[in-house]
Amino acid sequence: GIHGNEPEGRIATRELPHALASRPGALERITLTILEDLNPDGSAANVRGNANGVDLNRNYPASNFLPGPQFGQRPLDQPEAQALHELVAAERPHLVLVAHSWRGRHFVNYDGPAERFAELFAHHSGFPIERSDHLPPTPGSLGSWIGRTLGVPILTLEYLRGSDPLAAWLDTREAILAVVLSA
């Protein structure tokens, strides 16, 4: 996860390789790169930002980046964001999934050319699809950078805030597998 106070999707990152291994031939077809926790300082303190108080999901070089104390003075001025930037440059992903949580409801959001993946995820999970332009702005976000700036499909899985992480994984396992296996 990117936000330290959003643990709902973390089990999915640990369980996905095992789930894929149970599908014949899946591991031979897929290269999977998993980051369980991009924000260990925030996770340890159960806060949104990192140790510098910066929201790492607003610190990417998207065209809509806005400097500020909570977002960073410039894109990638936080070591965690810089590390992910370097990883993306090295791995050149064909699809990115990121887990967050939202108060009061769950949904899947997408940026870039990811509509078919969002529809597939929604079909298998029952999560409604929320378009980015119908949500509050997220300047400098991972979705803005990966999806809009780089043109790589990205799904943001917004789990219900406070939900049980194991239940969240079990509820979305088949949807995540369907998306990953279709990429």
Predicted regions and their residues:
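Active-site/substrate-binding loop(s) of hydrolase catalytic cores
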Residues: 2-134
